[in-house]
Regions:
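Short polar/charged helix/loop
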Residues: 1-145
Length: 145
């Protein structure tokens, strides 16, 4: 969900050719599967694209300028896989209100559409901070955003 939201927002800003956004799971059990039906529903309701095929984290993902984890367990696994600490952040750490909430973005997989809407809201609150981070990185490289 976060990948589709952020990539779409970057595209609307004209940055799709400058910033690459990918998504991958730390487990391989859903590799190749489409987005969960509730994820697709929520994304569609909010005007985002829904096409997705799940992938497993690989060297390409781990070499990104920033790897964003949704939960502490993902963070631990990504550290064990070798993602440098300076390149690893929790999604909610980009939300200015995150100090008032747990940093985990709850996985709604076994939940209702309402649970997916709640996850959407949590991600949506974090994305402005992630945009700010991208803008800072681009500015440091002399690229206008």
């Amino acid at each position: 969900m976060a990948e589709k939201m952020f990539a779409h927002q970057l595209s609307e800003r004209g940055l799709a050719d400058v910033v690459r956004v990918t998504s991958a799971g730390t487990g391989s059990w859903h590799t190749g599967d489409p987005a969960h039906q509730h994820t697709a529903h929520v994304l569609r309701e909010h005007g985002y694209p829904t096409f997705h095929r799940a992938s497993h984290v690989d060297d390409d993902h781990m070499a990104a300028d920033m790897v964003v984890a949704m939960g502490r367990n993902h963070m631990r696994i990504l550290r064990q896989l070798g993602v440098p600490p300076a390149q690893l952040r929790m999604m909610r750490s980009f939300d200015p209100r995150s100090a008032a909430h747990p940093l985990d973005v709850e996985d709604p997989y076994y939940g209702t559409v309402d649970d997916y809407e709640e996850t959407y809201a949590v991600i949506n609150a974090s994305l402005p901070g992630l945009h700010d981070w991208v803008d800072e990185q681009l500015a440091a490289r002399g690229i206008a955003s």
